[in-house]
């Protein structure tokens, strides 16, 4: 259901895929790339799943429960940088100021935030704001980050 909804309204992503293809930066059919991308964005996960994904990133790419490396350590800072600068789409800058943590939102209302070297915070709430980010999940994570003093910017930076 999420896939169908996202795919039928993916006008912006469809345009980007076509531009990338036109510029020689997308090496497959733009519509097929859009289908694959949208399908990956529509995978259902729980708050526990998000928390474990974030904890794995906080642990340098090693799953903290299994001890198994699931991502090369050298890629973790790159991924966290992308999360910090683009994880909230148009609200990424505001998010970084308010929460001060790299994070990624999902269309289902999930958000995962990472405190590198320490832990992750995950939350789910379906009500989205105009930018497509969960209102309650954002507030919960901002409050937790402030209470723990883990944000790197804003009024509660340590």
Give names to the regions the model predicted.
Residues 38-39, 44-46, 102:
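Generic, ordered loop/turn and secondary-structure boundary motif
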Residues 56-158:
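Structured C-terminal helix/loop/strand segments within mature extracytoplasmic catalytic/sensor domains
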Residues 1-41:
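Active-site-adjacent helix/loop patches that line small-molecule binding or acyl-intermediate pockets
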Residues 11, 15, 32, 45-48, ...:
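Conserved active-site and cofactor/substrate-binding residues in soluble primary-metabolism enzymes
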